[in-house]
């Protein structure tokens, strides 16, 4: 079972991100209402619809779809929340040293592609976490996605005390975290919901407008 990265060249036209939402029905009450409770940590799902693919994009899509081998393999796909998440300029406002804590000879540091040093600890099942964003400022608000490891979450409520955010999240924490880096460019490990999903039909034998769906996978640890 393999995990590969979604190619950066294939950007969908429309994206539907469905957050965890599964409920379980309980017994019917005396007033004929059925009580429901949330299922414990159900998966995210992601549907991507593409504009007309042709040329090299058709070949890239074919290669990705074939690499999935039905539901046998998984893909690491970004959530494509580019208009609402923190900008790359804001994220790259952070800098880091070499692994031994030293800088370059002229004092320069590395720029980061995501947050650096924003760490989260929590136990499985927790709904609320805290994180100190330091010099990054207040980059997270309710409605934004974030990542802990390979797991995406959505912030349902955020309150700030200086640079420290108290974040209510959905779903509840999928596992225990010990100083896990918080990411504002989250990805999701997903697999097809069925073997035939995402098939590419070529119109005029040349171009196609495929749609593909992924369900979050929990087969970790991923490598």
Which residues does each PLM region occupy?
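Extracellular/virion structural assembly segments
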Residues: 1-223
């Amino acid at each position: 079972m393999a995990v590969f990265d979604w190619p950066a060249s294939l950007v969908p036209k429309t994206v539907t991100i469905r957050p965890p939402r599964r409920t379980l029905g309980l017994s019917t009450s005396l007033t004929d209402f059925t009580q429901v409770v949330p299922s414990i940590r159900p998966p995210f799902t992601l549907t991507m619809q593409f504009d007309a693919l042709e040329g090299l994009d058709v070949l890239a899509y074919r290669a990705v779809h074939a690499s999935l081998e039905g539901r046998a393999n998984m893909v690491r796909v970004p959530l494509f929340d580019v208009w609402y998440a923190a900008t790359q300029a804001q994220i790259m406002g952070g800098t880091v040293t070499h692994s031994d804590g030293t800088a370059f000879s002229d004092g320069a540091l590395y720029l980061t592609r995501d947050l650096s040093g924003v760490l989260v600890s929590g136990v499985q099942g927790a709904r609320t976490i805290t994180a100190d964003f330091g010099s990054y400022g207040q980059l997270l608000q309710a409605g934004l996605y974030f990542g802990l490891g390979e797991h995406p979450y959505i912030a349902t409520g955020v309150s700030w005390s200086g640079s420290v955010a108290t974040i209510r999240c959905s779903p509840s924490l999928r596992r225990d975290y010990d100083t896990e880096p918080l990411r504002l460019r989250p990805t999701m490990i997903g697999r097809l919901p069925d073997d035939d999903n995402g098939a590419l039909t070529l119109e005029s034998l040349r171009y196609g407008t495929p749609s593909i769906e992924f369900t979050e996978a929990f087969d970790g640890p991923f490598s």
